[in-house]
Amino acid sequence: KLIDILADLSSIGVDGIIIQDLGVWRLARTWFPALPLHASTQMTVHNSAGVRMLEQMGFVRAVLARELSLAEITEIRRETSIELEHFVHGALCFSISGQCFFSSTVSGMSGNRGRCAQPCRRRYHHRGEPGYHFSTSDLCAIDLLPDLIKAGITSFKIEGRMKSAEYVARVVAAYRLVLDAPARERKEALRAAGEELALSFGRPATRGFLTGFVPAGIATPSQQGTLGQHLGDVVSLRQGLIGLTVNDRLHVGDRLRIQPQNDQAGTGFTVREMLAGEKPVRAVKAGEFVRVRNAGKGSVHIGDAVFKVGGKPRFTMSSEACQKRLAEIALPEGRRQPARDRAVQALVALLAARTGNAGTAADSLTVQGRGISDCKLLGQPGVERLQLPLTPENLLEVKKNERLLAGLKERLIWEIPPMLFGAQWQEYRRAVQMLAGQGFHAFRVANLGHIPLFAGLKDMKLMGGFRCSVLNSQAALAWHELGLAQLVVSIEDDRRNLAELFRRPLPLPLAVTVYGPLPVLLSRVPMRGIRSGAVLRSDKEEGYRVLTHAGLTEVIGEQDFSLLGHVRELR
């Protein structure tokens, strides 16, 4: 199916395809080289080293991580040459894109694969007090467009997936207005654009990280941060009618969402009927009491909040009309044939690769430790290797324990932190060089930007962690071609796909995480008022521990990730 899609896109001559999975990169590069490749923000490209890797891999554009400041973007632009794209408007995730496992943890639906259940928008309790600790404001950087252009951004990204044509039309029109305005007219353009954006019914706005490393107003626990304009609360329920006093105008045709007081999802519907007193009306003003016919599917209770999430449509073309218009511009079959031929060749090559024998690898157990004192674990039966985080504290311990480590260097794996912003990358380059000079050769990487850390160093064994998001054989082959000698498959993989993946003949061994703390979120958002080690609990009593280190917020599930009951099946 993927190859058919790539063939069709190549035939159409699209301006670019946005890639997250390196398996897609490998197929597109090999069989459809004319396709312009854009790196998704889900690839977590957040430093110059990562962008330079993309350049070498043939990408023409990088969609940068949303956690970067203008200063960091400027530095990346100065050291790289491909096009840079950045988000300017839309919902912000609490987690760094590509590093969130919250949704898959609570629902089995992966936010990394476009199926987020949005558990971050729910209510969590800290010391018995409820709050929306992970619910972020919406990004709105319309007043920073000149600064972003100066920093080197060549393309602005507006969130559009799962949004209505109405929303997209309003937001794009607002940003286009400001972009096209001469400098002397920009103030008036910003005012007019602000009025337009106010009709898109977003959450409270923030500039995100663009103006600094500690963003103001990005997450306020006391505010629900729910999408839309708060109209009031439900005060009566009678004969299918929801009664409330509205604090703004309401029209037939507006779209509402009823949000429960707990952390559950709301129900939405379009207003088709409403009564003022007992009289049907088309509109009411702020301050009036109105009863609205409940056309939603979910249950509604007294005290639930009512939000207006859409107004009178301005984009009126029906989906049927859109499909008819698209059919008129479809390419003739003759234009599509060359790409189809390449698709057949790609499929033949893939099917041939599937017929080989992957063989059976011997069991090998690697244990995750915290510090040098955990080297004693290497004396446990069956433990072949120990993996330690590469931290400043552990580097100091290496210098103090040279004699202890002399005979263990081949059994230690140093784990690079997943995020290396700005000057941190150079610090870790020096750390890697120091360790390599002392005879350490094995390192665990989690990001494309990690690979250049080892440039010029000989006999390095690079291994990919679970954050490399390996879910298919093509992704595994891609990482191998980039220099990796072993890979840990994604912790979001399922039984069926794992079985299929391990049947494939691959030039490098694959590993599976069988037990450990469950990483839920990795974020650059500081959680004010919550100390490192504190536990937040959902309404269902699910616990999540908050840890802060090196400028990052990490959230770990109280319940460990475990496949210990499936070890025999994995073998």
Feature-to-residue mapping (PLM):
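Active-site pocket-lining/capping segments in soluble small-molecule metabolic enzymes
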Residues: 1-45, 63-68, 72-155, 162-571
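Short, conserved phosphate-binding/catalytic loop or strand-edge motifs used
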Residues: 49
